[in-house]
Regions:
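Bacterial N-terminal signal peptides
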Residues: 1-7
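Sec/Tat signal peptide C-region and signal peptidase I cleavage site
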Residues: 9-13
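Mature catalytic domains of secreted/periplasmic carbohydrate-active enzymes
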Residues: 14-472
Length: 472
């Protein structure tokens, strides 16, 4: 029955991949993803209208006793008269300019862009035949995902999207437990099913999930499809496999490499690409993986009072992630009118300025024999933002053939000593060293206790310095 839901669409795709793990383990991560290293995530939706707390406002406003519930009642009145649906007309996107957005992302040095197609709230940010609750039919009356897809591709970046639809099974359930606008049957197809989180999704709901996912693939041809955590439900196993085989076969039909991002253990190794939310790894991981993190510290969507990561944080953590065979998918949360905050813009432009000088050490690289060295311990695991800043004594390595890039996660003021490239370490003989973005002659000595690099007179970029080390 699951496969049958795909109808003729699945029949048209080349049937190389079958919906079983043995077949799906033939998947190879495409080179475009391994080369890209840096992408932009976009959390934008109706939740940006109240702009309070986080993008989980639509759930939390229905949880009695929560700060969001108190704010909702004090600001908008009784929830039975003004519920989440009533924010939709206020979600105008009046200043949404996809050209300006993608131009900014390109200046930031991003190589792929992933807007959220549907978040946990159940409001689709695209034109769909499967739900009337969508941005084309109401609110801004625009196919937001479609407009972004067209512009992202036009400007030469890779288009992806995310679906958080499965979490909607339980996300809005608080409204069932007190007097709210849930009692109005006209809202049932938006707020429902609103079941308990420990309840297994029904076959009807999982079939609907699959149909929405395949519709997105057919309409927009994304090269990356990002899933949030709840698809790992055991009952979802046949649906996960069916979607993966469908999508990977579509990639073959399009002659484009495609990527599924998953969390936790939703997919086995070598069948899709692992994603860690606000987290990193302690060492190199094969196969390739990804971190999704947000410039905003408190919310993925726009929320008043949010604080933000600066370019230094993003750059040093990007380097750390890339040295371990990972990518960084960095999130922004635009306002409800479609404008991007000054803080996020500054961080993006600062990151892009550094990548303009040092991108050679990032794009198209692969991990070296070791990821790095230095005194600062890297955060590891999901929900593990780097609390201790890196320093100039921390170095991370990337490689292209016989070239090793040693990236200092600060600007050295004294000698830099790289133990992994000591004369007796067995990792190669140094032939030449240069600084990316500079014509300055680098002074160095390869000694038994390490490769000693004397400080440069000028740093060509802020925050981190990349040495290009050519080995014999």
């Amino acid at each position: 029955m699951v496969a049958g839901l795909l109808g003729g669409s699945a029949v048209r795709a080349q049937q190389v991949y079958q919906p079983n793990w043995d077949s799906l383990k033939g998947y190879q991560v495409p080179d475009w993803f391994r080369d890209a290293k840096f992408g932009i995530f976009i959390h934008w939706g109706v939740y940006s209208v109240p702009a309070f707390g986080s993008e989980w406002y639509p759930r939390n406003m229905y949880l009695q006793g929560s700060a969001e519930n108190k704010h909702q009642v004090e600001t908008y009145g009784p929830i039975e008269k003004f519920g989440y649906k009533d924010f939709i007309p206020r979600f105008t996107a009046s200043k949404f300019d996809p050209v300006a957005w993608v131009t900014l992302f390109k200046k930031a040095g991003a190589r792929y862009v992933v807007p959220v197609a549907e978040h946990h709230d159940g409001f689709a940010m695209y034109k769909t035949a499967l739900s009337r609750w969508n941005a084309f039919n109401m609110g801004p009356h625009r196919d937001v995902v479609g407009e972004l897809a067209a512009e992202i591709k036009k400007q030469g970046l890779v288009f992806g999207l995310s679906s958080h639809r499965i979490e909607h099974w339980w996300f809005m359930n608080g409204g069932r437990h007190f007097a709210s606008d849930f009692v109005d049957m006209k809202n049932t197809d938006f707020y429902g099913p609103a079941r308990e989180q420990n309840e297994t999704p029904s076959p009807e709901y999982m079939n609907d999930w699959l149909m929405r996912c395949t519709e997105l693939v057919d309409k927009y041809q994304p090269q990356l499809f990002w899933f949030d955590w709840w698809i790992e439900q055991p009952a979802m196993d046949p649906y996960r496999k069916t979607f993966a085989s469908f999508y990977y076969n579509k990639g073959l039909e399009w002659n484009k490499g495609v990527v599924i991002n998953y969390k936790n253990a939703a997919y086995p190794d070598n069948t899709a690409v692992l994603d860690l939310e606000r987290g990193k790894l302690a060492g190199i991981r094969n196969p390739a993986w990804q971190t999704d993190d947000a410039i905003g510290n408190k919310s993925w969507g726009y929320a008043a009072g949010n604080t933000f990561k600066d370019a230094r944080y993003v750059i040093t953590n990007l380097v750390d992630i890339v040295s371990k065979n990972g990518n960084l998918l960095l999130n922004i949360g635009p306002r409800s009118d479609g404008t991007i905050t000054d803080e996020e813009t500054a961080t993006l432009l600062g990151t892009g300025k550094w990548l303009e000088v040092n991108g050679e050490a990032i794009y198209g690289t692969r991990p070296w024999k070791v990821f790095g060295e230095g005194p600062t311990e890297s955060a590891s695991g999901s929900f593990a933002d780097q609390k201790i800043p890196f320093t100039a004594k921390d170095v991370r390595f990337t490689a292209k053939g016989p070239v090793v890039y040693a990236i200092m996660l600060g600007i050295p003021s004294g000698n830099s000593v790289i133990k992994a490239l000591a004369a007796g370490a067995g990792n190669g003989t140094v032939a030449r060293i240069s600084v990316l973005g500079s014509s300055e002659t680098v002074r160095w000595k390869q000694q038994n206790d390490g490769l000693v690099i004397l400080p440069s007179a000028h740093a060509p970029a802020d925050y981190a310095m990349a040495y290009k080390i050519e080995l014999r």
